[in-house]
Amino acid sequence: MPDSDNESGGPSNAGEYASAREQDRFLPIANVSRIMKRALPANAKISKDAKETVQECVSEFISFITGEASDKCQREKRKTINGDDLLWAMTTLGFEDYIDPLKLYLHKFRELEGEKAIGAAGSGGGGAASSGGSGSGSGSHHHQDASRNNGGYGMYGGGGGMIMMMGQPMYGSPPASSAGYAQPPPPHHHHHQMVMGGKGAYGHGGGGGGGPSPSSGYGRQDRL
């Protein structure tokens, strides 16, 4: 007796696979449902077919707008689609009523991204400042020892806010001092310490705004 479709993995499994591939084109339905519920009273319900309808419409809208923006980038020999390209595409396709609020949103989004980047850079500089401050007390003693011995040298300040205290191990007889004073014999072991701090170590803030990272390419889907 021939196997059924379910047993042989025939049309039934193929249909399920095709349905899964079709769902890959859409936004996750849980996200769509969550957005829809924000516009409804707390006790409102949304049917499954309503969620699926909005899911398909939103996904097609995204493909429609992105495809138009992609054409613009190709004409201008660019590989990265940015927010301004999408706003241009919406205006071209007749969605100009949505442009003003979206421009405000895009401007605010870029401001927040810039503030996040500055805050991250500031927190990193503050950590370097605290570590530099804790090491400066003990480091000053090491620097004094290094200054009294040949081969040791110290650096303070500098444009990048670097504090360096370094001594080199001594081998053989020490060279004569430039001042002509007798030098003590070199120790067998010499301290070697570096304290690195960014500009934040001296109270200077640093940071930079970051724009959206460019994607390596873009795809174009068929539009309705």
From Swiss-Prot:
Intracellular or extracellular location(s): Nucleus
Biased composition (Low complexity): 213-224
Pfam families per record: CBFD_NFYB_HMF
Stored PROSITE patterns: NFYB_HAP3 (PS00685)
Residue numbers spanned by region Disordered: 1-22, 121-152, 173-224
GO BP, sorted A to Z: regulation of transcription by RNA polymerase II
Biased composition range(s): Gly residues: 121-138, 197-212
UniProt keyword Transcription, yes or no: yes
Residue ranges that the Swiss-Prot or TrEMBL entry lists as coiled coil: none
One GO molecular-function entry: DNA-binding transcription activator activity, RNA polymerase II-specific
GO cellular-component term (any): nucleus
Region entry Subunit association domain (SAD), spans: 54-65
DNA-binding region(s), residue ranges: 27-33
Record-linked CDD domains: HFD_NFYB (cd22907)
Alphabetic keyword roster: DNA-binding, Nucleus, Transcription, Transcription regulation
Quaternary state and interactors: Heterotrimeric transcription factor composed of three components, NF-YA, NF-YB and NF-YC. NF-YB and NF-YC must interact and dimerize for NF-YA association and DNA binding. Interacts with NFYC2, NFYC4 and NFYC6.
Main function: Component of the NF-Y/HAP transcription factor complex.
Family: Belongs to the NFYB/HAP3 subunit family.
Name of the protein described by the UniProt record: Nuclear transcription factor Y subunit B-10
Gene that this polypeptide is encoded by: NFYB10
